[in-house]
């Protein structure tokens, strides 16, 4: 990364960082896409089981990844402030947190989750598939969190192409393992939907291996000496990471868990509806890679410029990100509307299920416009290290507004589609409130910068 002066130079740097991130996110989300489609091709029960299992793993995955992503703005600001020597200790303390979280999650999976599954309104077969799917994921949980830290370290330096290479190398391996474990090919056991969990868990370890190799072979990464001895546990650094990471993780948890809660509530409408909801939701997840990548890019660039005390440049990047996200939202909405029948055909050959998926995809258009406003704002706030309020707003918007609205509408003629209208309502409310917040934060940072200049 480097300082830019003109809007043209800023657009170029924005796209240089954004493009590899979006390719990475699309490739990562394709893992979920292939888990869903390949399980659906095995059976509707397998698809429903993966949907329930994913409803447990997805919010935990996203929330703890969000917590660990706290090192991205921390390192970006350190680089902007030319304090590179502090980067190694930040990464190491992030790894300590990652391993602790992995241990806790594995315990919860084996001690708590089975009991929850037995009390859910799904068949015993679907619950069993979900349980074995999660057991497979557990194989790779430590690796997943380690790779999250390493990815955040790499991205915070603006070297997003390296992360892209890591992902492009490993996801085809995941698809191959799905083919082996789900359908029992090449002498592997036929595990149905649960097999996708084991394939994903094993793939996470390959991600770590490739990450370590690239960090050790790339000069711009190797110079930080990440793997040259361990640094001491520093509670001040742990506190900083947690202080930013917990609100950030909660924000993501409240958003992803609301979708998981809706998946569980869909159980009242039957296995077919769960399968259709999960199929349409996986498409939305894939498309969400674009606004999410805008947010990640703004976190990196905003953090870098804020660390260098160039708030005007950080604000200009936010405007660029907003313009990009709105354009992307319009394109995604058009794709969902005009190609919904083709998209549904990827998931099933069952006409009734295909029709349900197409109906969900129409309502998914609302998500695209809400995310176009919300994601850039969240990315900018993370770059500014202002994340405490976002978690509160997320809880109110999603759980106290979005879910009740959706629940109420589900008893009308809208049925299960009412939940998706409720979800969209929550996203729009959060986008409105946080758009006000980001402007106030920028005003505060501007005053602080001026005061620092006067005192110096």
Swiss-Prot record:
GO molecular function, one term: antiporter activity
GO BP annotations listed: monoatomic ion transport
GO cellular component: plasma membrane
Bilayer-crossing regions: 13-34, 54-76, 95-117, 132-154, 161-183, 193-215, 244-266, 286-308, 321-343, 358-380, 387-409, 414-436
Protein location: Cell membrane
Keyword terms, alphabetized: Antiport, Cell membrane, Ion transport, Membrane, Transmembrane, Transmembrane helix, Transport
Membrane topology term: Multi-pass membrane protein
PANTHER family: FMN_FAD EXPORTER YEEO-RELATED, MULTIDRUG RESISTANCE PROTEIN NORM-RELATED
Function: Multidrug efflux pump.
Family: Belongs to the multi antimicrobial extrusion (MATE) (TC 2.A.66.1) family.
Name the UniProt record assigns to this protein: Probable multidrug resistance protein NorM
